[in-house]
């Protein structure tokens, strides 16, 4: 059987489970009203759209989405934008809130518990392979290639991994591997002595939060883990170390299945779990030749499509045209005679006359009043920025009125603006 046909048969035997219940506390006020996977990204998408689009483009069309923390925004997005799969062809996206399977007091206690609480649903669909995905990373990956790698290897678990500098290892689950890619050790966020990639001294393999299991093996692991009172019921801390100890874990480097892939192509994967990382990944898209190609017709990023008129850029009342460079603007935006550079504007943003906006991420339904100056600002949905406001130039004022990171990125929310107006 050739590789194409082999992959075709395999993805029919697989089901994906997207873990989308996390708060993402390091995003601070951006997740006050929504789960991290529901946070806006890239001018028109939500973060979860990337994992779901990877599933569809890879042929994986049996998908469960596990939700918990402040899930209304996420559920509404999935219902509006992801209801096009055809049930009569055994295609679906199941929305899976916490089942309180263990008892009536506990919601999901960890990533492994989130899967365990849906074990009956998984079994009812009868997949041979279960693909467990984090719903909060930005990347493009062909899961069918990883699935084929897993099936051909003979291992019972395969872990997706991305190459990082050793100096960044403290923030990730790091794996040691042998020359055949068998995982020999797995350490969650090591502070020192992180295992390096064979043949290097300064590069490590970090877990991407992507796992493929033989389904029966996964069920056995989860049922054993749930009875362990010492367990935190987490894949990275408990399940994967157990699999490694049983010599059943294979490492799958992201470079083997990233989209696009090939010589000289740097795989693009971003954990947007902090305000700085979120801001940087959004601004990546404003580059002349962005590393992440959202214009690829062969691997589209799907999302909910609100029916809106095109963005419009017009002179102000004095005839000043303004200048817009390296900026993405979604439908329904209107900009009057302002200067905007290297920024992203989500749908229905209004920028009034005389503004100067640089390196900003502006979420839907924001109004920026006349003569504002904004630099390195992330503005949450629905903010009404008063005329003449300056953000991003005075670190002391920014830290007093808003949330400012050590790198100088300022987060502005509707609540912050409302409180400022009351002073």
Swiss-Prot record:
| InterPro entries per UniProt | ADP-Glc_PPase (IPR011831), ADP_Glu_pyroP_CS (IPR005836), GlgC_bac (IPR023049), GlmU/GlgC-like_hexapep (IPR056818), NTP_transferase_dom (IPR005835), Nucleotide-diphossugar_trans (IPR029044), Trimer_LpxA-like_sf (IPR011004)
Q: Which CDD domains match?
A: ADP_Glucose_PP, LbH_G1P_AT_C
Q: So, what pathway does this thing act in? A: Glycan biosynthesis; glycogen biosynthesis
Q: What is its EC number?
A: 2.7.7.27
Q: Which UniProt keywords apply?
A: ATP-binding, Carbohydrate metabolism, Glycogen biosynthesis, Glycogen metabolism, Nucleotide-binding, Nucleotidyltransferase, Transferase
- The yes or no answer to whether the keyword Lipid biosynthesis is present is no
The UniProt record gives the binding positions of alpha-D-glucose 1-phosphate as 108, 173, 188-189, 207
Which Gene Ontology BP terms does the record give?
A: glycogen biosynthetic process
Keyword Ligase belongs to the record: no
> From the Swiss-Prot or TrEMBL record, what is one GO molecular function term?
ATP binding
Query: How would you classify this enzyme at the top EC level?
Result: transferase
Catalysed reaction(s) here are: alpha-D-glucose 1-phosphate + ATP + H(+) = ADP-alpha-D-glucose + diphosphate
For this protein, the record's Pfam families field holds: Hexapep_GlmU, NTP_transferase
Say which family it is in: Belongs to the bacterial/plant glucose-1-phosphate adenylyltransferase family.
- What is the annotated role of this protein in its UniProt record? Involved in the biosynthesis of ADP-glucose, a building block required for the elongation reactions to produce glycogen. Catalyzes the reaction between ATP and alpha-D-glucose 1-phosphate (G1P) to produce pyrophosphate and ADP-Glc.
The UniProt subunit note reads as follows: Homotetramer.
NCBIfam families noted in UniProt: glgC (TIGR02091), PRK00725.1 (NF001947), PRK00844.1 (NF002023)
Q: Provide the protein name.
A: Glucose-1-phosphate adenylyltransferase
Q: Which organism is it from?
A: Francisella tularensis subsp. mediasiatica (strain FSC147)
User: Which lineage do the record's taxonomy fields give for this organism?
Assistant: Bacteria, Pseudomonadati, Pseudomonadota, Gammaproteobacteria, Thiotrichales
């Amino acid at each position: 059987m050739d590789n194409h046909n082999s992959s075709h048969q395999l993805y029919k035997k697989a089901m994906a489970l997207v873990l989308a219940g996390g708060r993402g506390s390091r995003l601070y006020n951006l997740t006050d009203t929504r789960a991290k996977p529901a946070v806006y990204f890239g001018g028109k998408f939500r973060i979860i759209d990337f994992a779901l689009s990877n599933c569809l483009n890879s042929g994986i069309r049996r998908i469960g989405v596990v939700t918990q923390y402040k899930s209304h925004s996420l559920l509404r997005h999935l219902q509006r934008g992801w209801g096009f799969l055809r049930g009569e062809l055994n295609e679906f996206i199941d929305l899976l809130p916490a089942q309180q399977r263990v008892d009536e007091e506990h919601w999901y206690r960890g990533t492994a518990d989130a899967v365990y609480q849906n074990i009956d649903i998984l079994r009812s669909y009868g997949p041979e392979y279960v693909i467990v995905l984090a719903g909060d990373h930005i990347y493009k990956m062909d899961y069918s290639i990883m699935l084929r790698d897993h099936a051909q290897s003979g291992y019972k678990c395969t872990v997706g991994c991305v190459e990082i500098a050793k100096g960044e290892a403290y923030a990730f689950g790091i794996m040691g591997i042998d020359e055949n890619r068998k995982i020999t050790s797995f350490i969650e966020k090591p502070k020192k002595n992180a295992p390096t990639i064979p043949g290097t001294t300064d590069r490590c393999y970090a877990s991407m939060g992507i796992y493929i299991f033989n389904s029966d093996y996964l069920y056995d692991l989860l049922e054993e883990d749930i009875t362990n009172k010492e367990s935190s019921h987490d894949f990275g801390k408990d399940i994967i170390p157990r699999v490694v100890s049983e010599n059943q874990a294979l490492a799958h480097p992201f470079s083997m299945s990233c989209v696009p892939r090939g010589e000289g192509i740097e795989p693009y994967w971003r954990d947007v779990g902090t305000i700085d990382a979120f801001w940087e990944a959004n601004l990546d898209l404003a580059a002349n030749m962005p590393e992440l190609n959202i214009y690829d017709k062969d691997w589209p990023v799907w999302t909910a499509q609100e029916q809106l008129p095109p963005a419009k850029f017009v002179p102000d009342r004095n005839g000043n045209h303004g200048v817009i460079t390296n900026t993405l603007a979604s439908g329904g935006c209107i900009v009057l005679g302002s200067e905007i550079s290297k920024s992203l504007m989500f749908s229905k943003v209004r920028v009034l006359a005389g503004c100067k906006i640089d390196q900003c991420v502006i979420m839907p339904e924001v109004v920026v009043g006349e003569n504002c100056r904004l630099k390195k600002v992330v503005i949450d949905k629905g903010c009404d920025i008063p005329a003449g406001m300056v953000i991003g130039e005075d670190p002391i004022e920014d830290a007093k009125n808003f949330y400012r990171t050590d790198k100088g990125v300022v987060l502005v929310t509707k609540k912050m603006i409302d409180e400022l107006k009351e002073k």
